[in-house]
Amino acid sequence: MTTVGFDVPARLGTLLTAMVTPFDADGSVDTAAATRLANRLVDAGCDGLVLSGTTGESPTTTDDEKLQLLRVVLEAVGDRARVIAGAGSYDTAHSVRLVKACAGEGAHGLLVVTPYYSKPPQTGLFAHFTAVADATELPVLLYDIPGRSVVPIEPDTIRALASHPNIVGVKEAKADLYSGARIMADTGLAYYSGDDALNLPWLAVGAIGFISVISHLAAGQLRELLSAFGSGDITTARKINVAIGPLCSAMDRLGGVTMSKAGLRLQGIDVGDPRLPQMPATAEQIDELAVDMRAASVLR
């Protein structure tokens, strides 16, 4: 059994928002909006933010833009929340360069996605994640999301990677609770729910928290859910989980980027529109989203 000698909840947080990247009307990164949003999320209960992930539209942002966003958010909230930099790509050499650059800017940790599009074998995944983890002293979270990468990180590969001292956890977005529970027991890796619809089930099998999209709109409720579960008040945790369910339905319809940006605008926080090929919500979609947000008590 491998035991990860790193206090992940204390060092990386338990409620992390996979933060959108705000854009100006001309499509450039809106640093002022990023500062406002980061402060709002931390004030609402998030103890960590993940930048330049799926919801951050990382395939459409340059490395310079990723580093610009990282600097701005670190300056805004880095003294009171953990700031995790998304630093993965389908190119190992590029990922290594980005990891080093993010570490140089002061990131508190790294989220590294499974290489997508090229469908590498498990031996390639092991070599990729090892090369990235070797390139830094920062804690690394693996991001297992085969719905987007096609290839999963198989359980045996995760177990092998757990022996690396810098690989401390997994953002799990493939709904394999059984394997995740066994891996946590076998390795000591920390697991985060990467699927808001499964946040409570993941806690039940041992996950330490969430890397959430709906926390853009409901961070306070998710913090209450975590607190209730941690204190043994499962009834309250279940009630909160059901209450915020409409936001998960909205995300399924619209996608995380479109839902988050439209929902924030409804709450009075303008972070701009997505970059192509993502699309802003239509008027009809915004009306439907507003119904879901009211049902979840996150919009008056």
Swiss-Prot record:
The disulfides recorded in the entry are: none
**Domain of life per record:** Bacteria
Name the GO terms of the biological process aspect. Answer: diaminopimelate biosynthetic process; lysine biosynthetic process via diaminopimelate
HAMAP family the UniProt entry points to:
DapA
Give the residues the record marks as binding pyruvate.
T55, I211
- Specify one Pfam family: DHDPS
- Site for Part of a proton relay during catalysis, residues: T54, Y117
Cite the record's note on assembly: Homotetramer; dimer of dimers.
Report whether tRNA-binding shows up as a keyword of the record: no
Give the protein's function.
Catalyzes the condensation of (S)-aspartate-beta-semialdehyde [(S)-ASA] and pyruvate to 4-hydroxy-tetrahydrodipicolinate (HTPA).
- Look up the record and name the pathway of this protein: Amino-acid biosynthesis; L-lysine biosynthesis via DAP pathway; (S)-tetrahydrodipicolinate from L-aspartate: step 3/4
**What PROSITE patterns would the database entry show?**
DHDPS_1 (PS00665), DHDPS_2 (PS00666)
**One Gene Ontology term of the molecular function aspect:** 4-hydroxy-tetrahydrodipicolinate synthase activity
Enzyme Commission number(s) of this protein? 4.3.3.7
What's the family? Belongs to the DapA family.
Alphabetically ordered keywords of this record? Amino-acid biosynthesis, Cytoplasm, Diaminopimelate biosynthesis, Lyase, Lysine biosynthesis, Schiff base
Residues at the active site = Y143 (proton donor/acceptor), K171 (schiff-base intermediate with substrate)
Q: Which reaction does it catalyse?
A: L-aspartate 4-semialdehyde + pyruvate = (2S,4S)-4-hydroxy-2,3,4,5-tetrahydrodipicolinate + H2O + H(+)
Of the GO CC terms on this record, one is: cytosol
Record carries keyword rRNA-binding: no
Instruction: Specify where it is mainly localized.
Output: cytoplasm
Where in the cell is the protein located? Cytoplasm
Protein's name according to its UniProt entry: 4-hydroxy-tetrahydrodipicolinate synthase
Q: Which CDD domains match?
A: DHDPS
